[in-house]
Structure formats: C-alpha cells, structure tokens
C-alpha cells in the first residue's frame, strides 16, 4: 500500500487501504461505498479529498431489519439510482435488473464453510485448491441469496419494486454488524457443515468477537486465518 500509507492512518484495515490504493493508481473512477464501519467512512473521506473519482457515493446501510428500516433503505437505494442516472446519462433498466436474479442451488453435500470477514477471490481460490471437499463462501461476498419472486416484480411500480428489493436484501443472513445477528447461528448448525475456516482481518475487531463465540460453542473443526 505504498500510496495509501502516505495519506491513510496506519491502523486502517487492509481492505480500506486497497480501495484507496486502487483509486490513487487510477484503477477506479466510479465507486460506491457502504458505511458498514468506521473504516469505510474514513475511506470515503480520503477518496473524496483526492478528487480522483468521477462518481463517488456513500450508501447508508441500516443496522436493523424492521419495517421502518426497509422503507428507509429503499429510499436510499433509489437515491443512488437517481444519482448514477444523473452522472452517467443512462436510465435504470428494470428488465435487466429483474433478469439478474437466479435461483441458487441448494448444497446437500458435506462442505467446509468460510466465515468471517469478506474474502478476496484470490484467497477463496487458494482455499478451494487446498481443501479436498466442497468449500462454501459464507461471508458477505459469497452468501448472497435473495428470496425474490420475479413474476411479481414485473408488475411493480418503481417505489414498490425498490421496497421489495430492500426487503429481501435485509432479509438475508445478517452481517455480524447488524443489531440482531442471532440468525447467523443457522450457519453453524447446518448438519452438512464439516469444518470452518474463519477469516479475520488486521485492525477489524467486529469478527473477533464472533470467532470467540464460535470457538466456545462449535463442534466441528475450526481454523482461524488472518490477513492484512
């Protein structure tokens, strides 16, 4: 992180530094960040100060999944849509949006679960190459399953469509940062889960607490790995 280390705090997480580094190297001109933690808010401030992103947007992520938060989140997503339409000159394609949903395959075979902080594609491939069993990415980058009914979405007006989208987004397996993350216990109780590789990242405390809880209660083999 040669460039990002010059303008970011030394204790900023590696993911945050990698985002800043990519912007400074000219690899990213359009960026949507989610204010899921203090690090991402600092990344937004730093990237904004550089002036190197043509489109920069901070998406406000709720920490609850009640009805009020769903309505609020739907409005937030619509504002992002409108902001990008104004920037790009393109119009939101409802057909492409609805067609992008696919029915996920249900895994009924024994597998090793990767939990914790998001894993990069390189790290995920390395884990798969070295484990002689199916590997399921259960972090926020791999466990994205939305329960949508496409036929119903075709007839929805924009406001209803985005409310439905916000509903299913917040109805997913919750991130550990959510105020009510108890549903994450389902991940550990799956009878097909035969082991856990738990990924943490330096200077990110959230998932250290969950790891301690899993280590105390889980009955399958558990391996903790930490990256920068």
Predicted ranges, named:
Residues 1-228:
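An N-terminal assembly and electron-transfer interface module characteristic of large anaerobic redox
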């Amino acid at each position: 992180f040669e460039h990002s280390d010059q303008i970011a705090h030394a204790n900023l997480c590696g993911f945050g530094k990698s985002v800043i580094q990519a912007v400074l190297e000219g690899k990213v001109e359009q960026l949507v960040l989610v204010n899921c933690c203090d690090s991402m808010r600092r990344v937004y401030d730093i990237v904004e100060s550089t002036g190197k992103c043509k489109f920069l947007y901070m998406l406000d992520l709720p920490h609850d999944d009640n009805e009020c938060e769903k309505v609020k989140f739907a409005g937030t997503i619509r504002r992002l849509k409108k902001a990008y339409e104004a920037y790009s000159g393109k119009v939101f394609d409802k057909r492409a949006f609805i067609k992008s949903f696919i029915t996920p395959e249900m895994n009924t075979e024994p597998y090793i679960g990767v939990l914790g902080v998001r894993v990069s594609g390189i790290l995920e491939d390395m884990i798969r190459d070295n484990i002689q069993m199916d590997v399921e990415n259960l972090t926020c980058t791999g466990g994205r399953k939305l329960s949508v009914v496409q036929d119903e979405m075709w007839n929805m007006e924009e406001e209803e469509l985005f409310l439905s989208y916000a509903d299913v987004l917040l109805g997913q397996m919750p991130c550990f940062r959510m105020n009510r993350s108890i549903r994450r216990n389902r991940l550990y109780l799956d009878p097909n889960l035969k082991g856990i590789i738990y990924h943490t990242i330096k200077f990110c405390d959230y998932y250290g607490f969950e790891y301690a809880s899993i280590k105390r209660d889980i009955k399958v083999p558990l391996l903790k790995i930490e990256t920068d």
